[in-house]
Amino acid sequence: MWQERLAQLVTTCHWIGAKGWAPATGGNMSVRQDDTWCWLSESGRDKGSLTTEDFLQVEIATNQAPSGRKPSAETGLHTLVYRLFPEANVVLHVHTVNATVLSRIEKSDTLALQGYEMQKTLSGQHSHLDTVPVAIFDNDQDIDALAARIADYAQTRPLRYGFLLRGHGLTCWGKDIQEARRQLEGLEFLFECELMRRRYEP
């Protein structure tokens, strides 16, 4: 099953690369193998031309790669998602312009999206009248410290679809490739709408 997910993830990485959502080898993607292991893209690889050989097996509990090769810098964010959400089987971390800029414009720790029909692309959302909260965390080069802050936040407030890193990008996930990809595309559309709304509304 996970082998099929990995093959689907490679196709999704090519789609992400074609969209320009992981420029200059940025971003990282992973699939869960089981409760112990995940497969994560290797550091410094162009996402538009990845193959299955560019993914490393990583232990979820320790962030260690038995192969000795270097996994992506944000490995600890992927393994955190797998520990926090047993239903998550795919994690996508992208560096889109909309996510990067909007996370800097919004000064609070939550981006509240409301009034958009496309909110319904997110799992569990049924109305444009609902408010979709997307947590924003200050960026940190110490990924262990960043992961600890996110874990503390998740103890008291829900992280349902993904989160933003300020001036950095978006991390989102899903139970399978289809859900993760839909939520990435949906959130990216909503971020673009919100940026345009803030530009044009007085």
From Swiss-Prot:
SUPFAM superfamilies the record matches: AraD/HMP-PK domain-like
EC number(s) stated in the UniProt entry for this protein: 4.2.1.109
SMART domains from the UniProt entry: Aldolase_II
Classification via Gene3D superfamilies: Class II aldolase/adducin N-terminal domain (3.40.225.10)
Note accompanying the cofactor annotation: Binds 1 zinc ion per subunit.
GO cellular component term of the entry, any: cytosol
Catalytic activity from the UniProt record: 5-(methylsulfanyl)-D-ribulose 1-phosphate = 5-methylsulfanyl-2,3-dioxopentyl phosphate + H2O
Swiss-Prot/TrEMBL cofactor(s): Zn(2+)
PANTHER family: 3-OXO-TETRONATE 4-PHOSPHATE DECARBOXYLASE-RELATED, FUCULOSE PHOSPHATE ALDOLASE
Sequence similarity: Belongs to the aldolase class II family. MtnB subfamily.
Function (record text): Catalyzes the dehydration of methylthioribulose-1-phosphate (MTRu-1-P) into 2,3-diketo-5-methylthiopentyl-1-phosphate (DK-MTP-1-P).
Name of this protein: Methylthioribulose-1-phosphate dehydratase
